[in-house]
Amino acid sequence: MQPDLFSKASKQSAATQPKEIPDASDPSARAAWLRSELNRHNYAYYVLDNPIVPDAEYDQLFRELQALEASHPELLVFDSPTQRVGALALTAFPPVTHSVPMLSLGNGFEDEDVLAFDKRVSEGLNSREEVEYATELKFDGLAINLRYEDGVLVQAATRGDGATGENVTANIRTVRAIPLRLHTNNPPKVLDVRGEVMMYKADLAKLNARQRDAGAKEFANPRNAAAGSLRQLDSRITAQRSLRFFSYGIGLLEGADMPASHSALLDWYAELGIPVCSERAVVRGVQGLLEFYKATSEKRPQLPYEIDGVVYKVNRVDQQLQLGFVSRAPRFAIAHKFPAEEALTTVQDIEVQVGRTGAITPVARLAPVLVGGVTVTNATLHNEDEVRRKDIQIGDTVIVRRAGDVIPEVVAFVPERRPASARPFIMPSSCPVCGSPIVRLEDEAIARCSGGWVKCAAQRKGGLLHFVSRRAMDVEGLGDQLVEQLVDKHIITTAADLYKLGFRALAELDRMADKSAQNVLDALEKSKRTTLARFIYALGIRHVGEATAKELARHFGNLDALLQASPEQLLEVADIGPVVAASITAFFTDAMNIELIEQLRAAGVTWPEHVVENRPRPLAGKTFVLTGTLPTLSRDAAAEKIEAAGGKVAGSVSKKTSYVVAGAEAGSKLAKAEELGVTILDETGLLQLLDSDEQD
């Protein structure tokens, strides 16, 4: 079990906390407080490998101290955090003195920072031409120096304070991506490879699942997991965890010529068998830098690992040497950081929301905070057990994360900032919407409102929104606000009531004009012509998603056969187990659900009869994953062709995946397929496979 380094850091630093935080009116006191605060965070981040604030808050404090020292030079002291790289090494591992210091990079946060960097570089080189830059990713992991002597890995050390790190050779030898011997017959006498040890997001999920099963502490993010794994005293534990490595720089080099450029250095590394990230480019001028930043930002959610920015380096080594270094960073490089995906805020309250199936979900109401470029005021806490496990209380200061389009989540609370007035969340005993009892089955993590859609307006609204959604009945114009009005004004109760709506009832609603009302009626009329699979999915049967609805339609051929199916017959359908079969049976034995189905049929909802084919389907048993943009087929069209031939379309790549169909700008799914050796097809290959199967 991991030691609780979080609380350890809190206890150690408690004495350094002033009773009152000085403000800018007293520059000397403010600078002293900033130095103390940054040193405290440095210790938690670099030494304990368990940061107690997000990077964005640390960066803000660091820049404030830099500005204060610039405007008041007399406040600059030799041991200021602005004059050093990191923190001291633990004594648990032998210290290692780096032959060439491992410096940090300066940070840029806005386009203007990049423009200023390019201007400084051009002036430093006295160049009127656009400078050539190497661009690469800024990984969110642990910086490492790998020393090779005569081609053999002899030592690995952490960055530490930049001058002295920790010897973690035994643990690094367990990272399979790192070669123990370079792939060359003519190795340099000494080569120091600089790079980052990290953990992929999927590997973190697997590790945390094992941690939960063992009753051990989970890791908040991939960086903490990588750092905690690499700094295990028992290397056998490290060997059980999937760590990765990418190289990005060089320290000492003896017995070989230095490559002429940074891009050539990485190409050389790749030839030596040292992992190099493919997400890099050589560009010219500031426009090339910003285009790389934009492209990387767009593909960031699909990457299999965490990054917090990109790095720009003057590509030519002779120009790097000409520009030189400042006290803590090279002049020839800068990190262009993304908007923070983690931030600190406070939990003002914890309320519960009711979903369409009655699921009761605790939601944290947060003091507004900017995360990933979006103001976040709410974050899901998933279920009661999750709240207890993370020990989130009302009044806590918490770390909130928002990555890409992912729903904001509360990662952890900050123990040292918990106020005396904090109070735990208590799950209500009755539904906040309809007052029905909240129940929770023994084998389920989710508590549910027992009122059902008849009693509970929240379940009615959720069920109706699901019914009209694009992949269900696909009724354009019926959004959240309109459905809410229709339910709250008691105009509709069930999905069948939608098809009884009149023009005047719609036109008189808030924010509805005559044209909008007619558009909704036209969309409802159009939706009556659907497919059996869409209709089954639209009913909102618990545990029945799109794929299962398609399998049910394909297997039974018509709705009446499905309505009469026994649990044993349902179990004959692909991918349906006892839990799903029981849920389907329960739905179709409920008299109110049968009445709803008959009302929908009476309203004119219809679909083509599906003929059950007895001949074997050629792609039966094959699982496909679609990624990227195909030249002519939309993803839906490609999926329909695959499913019509009996194949199954999944959302993620695994060892069970038969084919990955990749188009332009394919992301992490393609990389995962290559890693697992899954067969990769382009659109032409898919169509050829379908054609050959049809001929067979």
From Swiss-Prot:
It catalyses: NAD(+) + (deoxyribonucleotide)n-3'-hydroxyl + 5'-phospho-(deoxyribonucleotide)m = (deoxyribonucleotide)n+m + AMP + beta-nicotinamide D-nucleotide. NAD(+) binds at residues 55-59, 104-105, 136, 159, 196, 313, 337. GO terms for biological process: DNA repair; DNA replication. Residues 1-28 are annotated as: Disordered. GO terms for cellular component: cytosol. The keyword Metal-binding applies. It comes from the Bacteria. Belongs to the NAD-dependent DNA ligase family. LigA subfamily. This is DNA ligase. It comes from Herminiimonas arsenicoxydans. The gene is ligA.
